[in-house]
UniProtKB/Swiss-Prot annotation:
Similarity-based family: Belongs to the CTDSPL2 family.
Gene3D superfamilies assigned to the protein according to its UniProt record, in alphabetical order: HAD superfamily/HAD-like
Protein name, per record: CTD small phosphatase-like protein 2-B
Transmembrane stretches, start-end: none
Ranges of biased composition (kind: Basic and acidic residues): 63-82
Originating organism: Xenopus laevis (African clawed frog)
Top-rank EC class of the record's enzyme: hydrolase
Polar residues bias (residue ranges): 46-62
Composition bias type Acidic residues, residue spans: 30-39
Amino acid sequence: MRLRTRKGSPRSSHGAAGRTARCKRKHSEEDEEEESPLIEEDKLPTQETGLLSTIKNFIKGSTNKEDRENPAKKSRVERDFDNNLITSTPRTGDKPSKPIARVRRKSQVNGEATAYEVSQHMKQNGKLEDLPCTTSPPRTTLLGTIFSPVFNFFSPANKNGTSGSDSPGQAVEAEEIVKQLDMEKVDEFSTNTATNGASYPSPGAPVRTTASSWLEGTEDTPEREIPPLTAPVSPESGYSSAHAEAAYEEDWEVFDPYFFIKHVPPLTEEQLNRKPALPLKTRSTPEFSLVLDLDETLVHCSLNELEDAALTFPVLFQDVIYQVYVRLRPFFREFLERMSQIYEIILFTASKKVYADKLLNILDPKKRLVRHRLFREHCVCVQGNYIKDLNILGRDLSKTIIIDNSPQAFAYQLSNGIPIESWFMDKNDKELLKLVPFLQKLVELNEDVRPHIRDRFRLHDCLPPD
């Protein structure tokens, strides 16, 4: 009898050996995965099946999901940029609103890059980095929130309304406009605000405004002729012809501070009864008070780096640190040292306290030159415009003088105001020195200062007729 030999045993041993090899390979792969997961990912085939692949995919998927739900913590600057703090511009494709469109014109006047030319991003040090962008709509910056904001005309609907008649919607809209506007003010009617003894234009003469030669980095802008102040003014005429409106459809129309002053609404009873913000005078306090503006009157500040800045300092605003660059007006310190001997010097600015107070702490740390400081919260907000009502000082207005580059800032006490030319970078400027003799004379006369200021500067003659 012949017996058949079964060949299953070798196959079984071979299978066992295969299973042993696969187990070893499996453990080896798990060890290699623990030691070098990146290398293991490269060795794995593009499509895996089985329990190990499922576990890996589950781990990878949960990690990515966790990253998406809990992103890495960003720096303050990056987080603020995402929240659109420094730029209130709508994203590309959104139609810019009218107040934002006006900012482009003003930026050109003050020598800054226009909003249509660059899109600014934040660096880690709080500076702005210009990146070319041809499709970005106009932008507004933080300047309008910590620095002095720009004045805007009253709307035709509420031009003749009182400051107390604003509806909540109008008040909110006005505040939003102020927040959107830039800090740097246009040199409005420099002929009227000059203090070098030059004659002011008569009410019947046409007024022209041009960009001053000392404005940094600006191109010559065409002159715009303003109708005579004796001509009747209506909201429809708006001080501009139809041709001018077509040419400057998206630009900022020329701002007439005296038209603004003429139509400013009266103060409300609540505003008139505000408590004085300053302490009572002491025996050592000079009898006369001199109120000084800050931005473009004594200094020029910018968030953009200025190569000729006299000093720089950081400002913490809404959890973000910004670097402020400061230029000092020529004869700034000499003027303050001489005037502080005969006047009670009071700084009154429409800027935020977080910026202005820190700057004054650097310039006058012991308060030897400036006795008191008033900020935006001490101004009167009239339909979105900050006006400096001198009644809040608690001082005798017959012995109080205010110097400001914006006449509309002292609209309620026009006879107490001395206009001065806006300053940005002119190193040959002497406007502060030119005021010294007149200010000294007012103290020597020891009379009501208002008639002398009115006769010298004749600001009332610049007001449009009724």
